[in-house]
């Protein structure tokens, strides 16, 4: 409402709307504030101008691409939920073993889901982008990013993934954002993507 609230003569701090950024995570950074092994972390390499943030999910140390960052833990948890329905899209470069061959038909089987070491993955979608010699480029889309899911799916197909890049998370795409750069998403855009009820609950300002 814009009213000023005083308690014992002190101005109460107004609730801050959650903020959200796109970040182009480089390969070789751990998605953690601290790493027991002393490896470089995402949060130690962010611009000093950023406030304290948490990540929306994680990317493996050898995975590059889009990582969403937010000042609000509740927003992060909401966006991580598979029930949100947002697709995570990856571009994968992998090497085919001497006895393996990948076709679109074999990739279409991922739509039914699969189990690896007792863990259920999918259903997921994968498209064969191109092949060059024993290398293959795939586009994989999933609604839930379990630990090392893309690499484990690739291994199940007889592939050895050697490059993994997340190109989008829900409606937010990596685009031409440079490696290591951050770009804040406007409040209006966040509100439009989350919908009115969720936005109001999380304190997003439209």
Question: Which residue ranges define each predicted feature?
Answer:
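Basic, flexible Lys/Arg- and Gly-enriched helix-loop patches that mediate nucleic-acid binding at interfaces
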Residues: 1-206
């Amino acid at each position: 409402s814009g009213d000023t609230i005083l308690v014992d003569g002190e101005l109460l701090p107004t609730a801050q709307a959650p903020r959200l950024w796109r970040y182009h995570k480089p390969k070789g950074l751990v998605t953690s504030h601290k790493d027991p092994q002393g490896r470089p972390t995402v949060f130690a390499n962010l611009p000093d101008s950023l406030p304290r943030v948490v990540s929306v999910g994680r990317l493996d140390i050898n995975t590059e691409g889009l990582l969403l960052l937010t000042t609000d833990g509740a927003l992060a948890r909401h966006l991580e939920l598979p029930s949100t329905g947002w697709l995570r899209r990856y571009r994968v470069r992998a090497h085919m073993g001497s006895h393996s061959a990948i076709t679109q038909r074999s990739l279409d089987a991922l739509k039914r889901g699969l189990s690896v070491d007792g863990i259920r993955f999918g259903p997921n979608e994968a498209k064969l982008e191109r092949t060059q010699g024993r290398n293959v480029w795939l586009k994989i889309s999933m609604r839930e990013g379990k630990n090392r899911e893309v690499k484990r799916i690739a291994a199940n197909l007889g592939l050895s993934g050697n490059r993994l890049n997340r190109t989008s998370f829900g409606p937010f795409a990596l685009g031409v954002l440079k490696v290591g750069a951050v770009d804040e998403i406007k409040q209006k855009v966040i509100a439009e993507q989350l919908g009115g009820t969720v936005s109001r609950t999380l304190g997003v300002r439209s």
